[in-house]
Amino acid sequence: MSKIKISDLAKEFGMTWKELAGEIEELTGKTVKSPSTKIDEEIVSLLRDVLQPAEEVEEAVEKKVEKEKGYRIFELSHDWNIPFEELAEDLKAIGYTKSIDNFTILDEETVNRLKDYIKEKKEKEKEKKKEEKEEKKVKVEKKVEEKPVEVKKEEKKEEKVEKVEKKEEKVQKKPEKKEVKRKEKIVAKEEKPERKKAVEEKPKKKEVKEVKKVEKPKVEVVEEKEETKIKIPEAEIRKETKEEKAELEALRKLMGPQPKKKKKKKKKKEEEKAPVETKEKEEELKIAIIPEVVTVRELSDILDMPVNEIMAELLKRGILATVNQTIDPEIALQIAEEHGYLAEIQKEGEEVKIVEELPQEEKKKLLGEEEEEEENLVERPPVVTVMGHVDHGKTTLLDTIRKTDVAAKEKGGITQHIGAYKIKLSNGKEITFLDTPGHEAFTTLRARGSKVADIAVLVVAADDGVKPQTVEAINHAKSAGVPIIVAINKIDKPGADPERVKRELAQYELIPEEWGGDTIMVPVSAKTGQNVEELLENILLVSEILELKANPNRPAIGTIIESKLDPKRGPVATVLIENGTLHQGDYFVAGFTWGKVRAMFDERGRQVKEATPGTPVEVLGFNEVPQAGDKFVVKPSEREARLLAEQRKQKYEEELQAKRTRIHLENLKDVKEINIILKADVQGSLEAITKSIEELSEKFEDVTINIIHSGIGAITESDVMLAAASNALIIGFNVRPDASARKAAEEEDVDIKIYGIIYDLIDDLEKALKGMLTPKEREVLLGICEVKQIFRIKGVGTVAGCMVTEGVIRRNAKARLVRDGVVIYDGEITSLKRFKEDVKEVAKGYECGLMLKDFNDIKPGDQIEAYEIVQEKAE
């Protein structure tokens, strides 16, 4: 007796083997566990008698499907031109609680409820759009009154609106026709013999179409689309084989509703083209001003459209662009108009103007210096600049106030850079201090410090009296209109004579209060802290009299106090906020530079998110190193900041080029020239040295010193090659040449001079110009070692564990510690060991331990250069 596999039998009945196994268990009580199980012929016969043949099952299923197919969600989505997601939301809105997917079948009652809900929703949307349209028309009319040229364009658009509204009345009848079509489709499927009849009725509709075509040609597109849709049920009504059904089902699951929707939209665009789109655009009419230079992202913001949509519009035009790439303004104009905007192109010059060329009132407004309303102002900390002669104790005084040891880090105790610090007193009051360099070379920095300060503290040593730089500081403070408080320092020293200082200051119209004048003079000792509290109280007193206020709720403006190029963080600047609040992420312009605030740090190196008026912060995010003293102004966009900076720079370069051309044409044959390449550690030092060299050049009529290049950071190979090409001398201030630069200098025979004190630099240059150089000292590099590890030994100090990478390291040799190309220390090696033994020298490739004289701030990665000074005859 032959047996049949249950899997084969399941195919015959159009069932899965598990479903068939269930039927067998119900009829016979036998359990089937595998699709390969074979069934006796008797059971097969019983199943064939009991179960309906597969073909009949198929017909029944087909009838059921055909009867209910019109109510599947994906069909409704397709025919009603409503996205599946929107239909699903509408179903939830009418209280449909079952799970929803593309093939969910809805009963007739649910479909009717859904249809009524959608119709009601569309009516509400239509009313809302009409109201919005009226509001927009009013706005456009106002715009037209301002711009008469656009009246014709507006009239044309109004005519289009009327035409489209007429057409809309006909298009709105579409859902009813679709419903008739749906009913015809259901009847056609229930009564299969009448299919041909339904097809034969089509020509009647075509006749109607032709009559309408004579009256209103535009209706033809709509009617043809309806006729095209009637063919859909004809294609679907045909009987499908099981394989075709399976393929169709799989295809539908894969495709989902989205591809159909896209295809439909595309077809709709091709058939209907502009008319319906015009209606939508007219209803959403907006104004857009397109800048002459615009990026994809900026256009996205202007049109309030996603970036990917803008990029898609560009792709349609064959343009592949990134988000930050600029695009043709005409293309941007086309995109704007296609999305319902009245758009025009605005020229660059209409938006961004060079501040220096503006009238005074407009310039103040652009720089944020216009008068603020009283109700917006709040009290701000006073900004105090500390001024005075060299070594009169300015930095030591600040150290006493801040309880920090900044002076120990300065070269020879002389302040080389402006520092800015905000301190909080015990009474909760805050004061911002500027530590301005006191010696003559820093005149420009000191002048700059006076301008940003509210109060000047003039430090005069009680044992030294008034000096030339003291007088200069007085003049700067007076010219800036800054009140002066005199701190007579070093009263603890033998020979201190505060009364003598008062007499000398009286000659410069600084009369002490006890003599009937209005200048506050406080005798202090920065070393012991005597009377420092009294000095701070007087600063706060003057601050109250000045009524210092600012508006923290506006974009920030400030001044660049100091700037430098950090090897790891890029261009960095200390900014003193004078008005407004600076936030992380703000766009700004400062002189020729611009950028975005990437990060901010306070005077203690802590990161902050915002900076209020009177606060100094270190700002990261400049496109290049700004000039100290430049005005720092926050701008609303990157584009505006960038354009303003570029225009300023271009104007400056044009003026500079014209100036250089005049100098060369008039004096090139008549003067001797010395070309110099100048590199320094910070911007302030660079400016001070440049000014000193210019003053030196003026003393010698027959010699001109040209600084052909200057910059911040280590001396590089490109600097050496420039010097070789222009026969120039390289001068480094607190910076060193890197390895490639040293090698190139030897090969090209380029002279590199390194200095740590400005006086020495200027003195050497002056002697060279006079031809009076005495037998000079020359530096000879002995070797270089890299710090690998540090050891802190109690009572001894810091020992640096090093690897010698070049030459030899000798005990008692002079040593220079270089960190990121900047000289941190210059002294000598006091101890040199290999393991535990003292040695005289350590050669390349060996490890050693060494100590530096009076210096413990050594870090792994630092380079220590050992060198010696040899005497040479002057050439």
Curated annotation (Swiss-Prot):
Keyword entries, A-Z: Cytoplasm, GTP-binding, Initiation factor, Nucleotide-binding, Protein biosynthesis
One annotated GO molecular function = GTPase activity
Stretches for region G3? 435-438
Q: Where is this region: G4?
A: 489-492
Write out the ranges of the annotated region (G5): 525-527
Could you tell me which cysteines form disulfide bridges?
Answer: none
Q: G2: where is this region?
A: 413-417
Q: Name one Pfam family in it.
A: IF-2
Region annotated Disordered sits at 123-204, 240-278
General function of this protein: One of the essential components for the initiation of protein synthesis. Protects formylmethionyl-tRNA from spontaneous hydrolysis and promotes its binding to the 30S ribosomal subunits. Also involved in the hydrolysis of GTP during the formation of the 70S ribosomal complex.
Query: Which HAMAP family has this protein been placed in?
Result: IF_2_B
The entry's protein name is: Translation initiation factor IF-2
Which organism is this entry from?
Persephonella marina (strain DSM 14350 / EX-H1)
